[in-house]
Each structure stands twice: as C-alpha cells, then as structure tokens.
Amino acid sequence: MKRMNHRLSLGAVSLAVLALAGCASNAPGVNTPTRPSSSFAVPGLEKPAEVLVDRWGVPHLYAGTLYDAFVAQGFIAARDRLWQMDLWRKRGLGEMAKDFGPAWVESDRAARAVLYRGDMYREWLAYGSDAKRVAEAFTAGVNAYVAQVRAKPALLPTEFALLGYQPATWSPEDVVRIRHHGLTLNFSSEVDRARAFCAGAPGAKADWLRRELDPPVTPKVPEGFDPCNLPVAELRAAYLRATDAPRFTKENTRVGMNAGASSAPVALLPGSAEAIAAKAEQDEAAQGDPTAAYGSNNWVIAPKLTSTGRPILANDPHRAHGAPSLRYMTHLSAPGMDAIGAGEPFLPGLSIGHNGTIAF
C-alpha cells in the first residue's frame, strides 16, 4: 500500500484529505500510525471526494464523477501552489501593475498584445466536446480555495502578506487564453519565416529550407504587409517583456501592511529596458541563419529490445526549470479515468503520465 501523509475530504457535500505517516498494515500487533485528516465544503462538487497525500506530497484524488475530479484538482493545486498560480494568471492577463505598481505597465501592455482575444465561443468548439466543462470544474475548485483563504487570511501564502494583496478569482477562459508562458516557438517561427522569405529570391520556397512543412503549406504575405521591414529586435524585446519571469529586488515595491515591521523591503521588477534590449539582441544573434532547421527528441524502444518486454517512451517537453516547479504531480481517479503524472498547477489534467495501459 502507498505510504500516505494526509487525507482531505471535499464536498459540496465534503472533501476529505488524509495523510498516512507510515505504511498501513493489518498484521496482528502492528499499530497503525495516526492519520491526520481534514474536511472542506467545496462548491461545485456533485459527490463527496477524497484526497490522499503520500509521503512525497503527491495528491491522489478519488472522485465520484469525472468532473468532480477536476474540481478537486483545482482545489488541491491552489492549496499547494496558490501564489505561483495567481502570479501566472496575473502575468498572462497583463494585470501586474494593478497590484505591483507602474513599473509593470509596459510588461502588462506587451502581455495583453499577445493575449488571445478571439471569439471564445468558437474557440471552445475547437477543443474536445467537454473541454469547457472541464475548465469550469477546475476553476470552480481553484475559486473554492481562494474563497477559503480570503475568509481565513492566516491560510494565505506568505507572498500575499508581504506584497499586500489578495489572490484573484479565476474564469474558465483564463485557462485557455494565456498561451505565452514559456511557449515561444510560434512567435520566433513567424519572425524567422519572414526573414527566410526576404533572404530568398523572388518566388523561392525559402521557408522549406528553414523547416520542412508537413502537410505542405504555401506561405502567403498579407496585402500591404512588408515582411522585409520587420523591426525584429523590437518585436523580440516586446515578447521578452511579456514573457520573462518576474524578478524580485529590494529597490521598488515596499512590503504590504500585514508583513510586519521587521520584514525586509521586497520588490517585483520587470527587467529594465536596457536588460530587455540586450537580451533581445543576444537572442537575435543566437538565431543565426534564418533558414536553419530544428529537430526534437521523442523516441520509443520496442518491447522486444527491453529487459522487461515493455516499450519505453522518452520525451523532453522543452519547458524551462523554475522554482516553484512548473510541474505538478497528481493522481486522478474517477469513473472512466485513472491516471497519474505531471501537469502544470494552473491547468486541468495531466501532460505527461500513464494509466493502467499506456504512457503518454
């Protein structure tokens, strides 16, 4: 049996969290360790759910319905990573200046320039049939925990007290509108495509030299647009301004009123204009030949070539390391679903993991 450290019960009804300090045993004469547990009322749950937290801190979520699993996931992710999640949302929506001051206006402007602003009705239709309902369930769980910490400020992570602000509530659209945290290749590819077009002779398929297009696509230049006159350095600088991780310093923003007199000054500063420009120039130089090709690294070893007789899948998702980690481990168990793996704390579901049959 897994070693568990904490149990949590959730429900509109209730959600229960259990932590098992040791390995449970039914053997005679063996004492079962104390198992601290808590229960919470979580709006949005249709049936009671249970969360078992193992000794590594991984939550194992057991729900009565598929969507309840995502409500529980949002609640537990917020309980474990609330400040990280709130900062991710604020950064992506361009709302940093609201709480951190005018030093963030330009980075907010850049973030909003690349934020998805299309027709959300059509956008939801482009996903799986239940994608919106999953996002609604997940954000309901996040908001349930946000409501809990607002009612009990002692539960707020220290960062909120230091910076003197409250976590925001989420909408389902927040989950899909923010697309530029660490995902940069589409932006850089558009710039490189324009450079390749201008580097080739008229009518040449220069983009095919940069990257094989499958299925075949013929790039078309919009009427009135001159791809050879792009302010490449300025574009890269703007995108860096929108996506670079926030930096903490001691020079700008004072601590919040609730932080205590002995707290050292804390500031959130975006990169300076000079630093952003310098980094953009470095990135520009690193791009080298705009016709250069790129590869990736996803590979599989067949069962007949492994010692276990099972296939091995290896993949690098190309995401940056950070603290707190970008990855968030979760086990989701509900009717029709039983999988464990890593996702991101601000997104429902799993990105990398396995169920009882396959790895993905």
Residue ranges, per PLM feature:
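Substrate-recognition/specificity elements adjacent to catalytic centers across diverse enzyme folds
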Residues: 26-312, 317, 323, 343, ...
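Compact, glycine/acidic-enriched structural inserts
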Residues: 336-360
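Secondary-structure transition/capping motifs at alpha-helix termini
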Residues: 148, 333-337
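Short active-site loop/helix that positions an aromatic residue
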Residues: 318-332
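Bacterial N-terminal signal peptides that target proteins for export
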Residues: 2-13
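Residue-level signal for mature regions of secreted extracellular proteins and peptides
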Residues: 16-17, 221
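C-terminal motif of bacterial Sec signal peptides marking the signal peptidase cleavage site
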Residues: 20-22
